[in-house]
Amino acid sequence: MNDTKIPITILTGFLGAGKTTLLNKVLSNTKNGRVAVIVNEFGEKGLDHHLIEQSTDDVVLMQSGCLCCSIRGDLPKTIERLILKNIRNEINFERIVIETTGLAEPGPIMQTLLLDNVLASNTQLDGIITVADAVNGSQTLDAQFEAVSQIALADLVILSKTDIALPKQIQDFENRL
């Protein structure tokens, strides 16, 4: 499809940790270039999609289930469609960000990107960024295996809610990580 591989970043994190807030900041910074965003929602209402402020970037919302499990077959097709539209100059972007639901494990998404022949030829996994809530992070790690997986596979962990967390909460959570 393309001579230049398109970087893909997986943005994951705990439920309510602030993934969409971070994504909005990235999209509003013009230094980041044009970004195609794939927003995945678990359930029928795309709440995060409504929270994403309007931007000039293309947002693809897939609502048929958890990105990492039930719609893995749709992810390659969605990315391929984006790449084709980019090649045809129907849309213009330099990178793709996949924002997962807080229930997603990034491993299967990463595996899809690396093992699908078309995706492996046209994209490169740029990294996995996990947003972790400094206030509730330890409890979330205790309660949800998906959160442990999100932290374990992260290239970068961003602590959110540090402005409302107690210094001891932040220190304890950082030590645990």
Feature-to-residue mapping (PLM):
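A short, aliphatic-rich alpha-helical micro-motif
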Residues: 90, 148-151
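A short alpha->loop->secondary-structure connector
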Residues: 116-123, 148-149, 174-177
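Charged helix-capping and loop-helix junction motifs
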Residues: 143-145
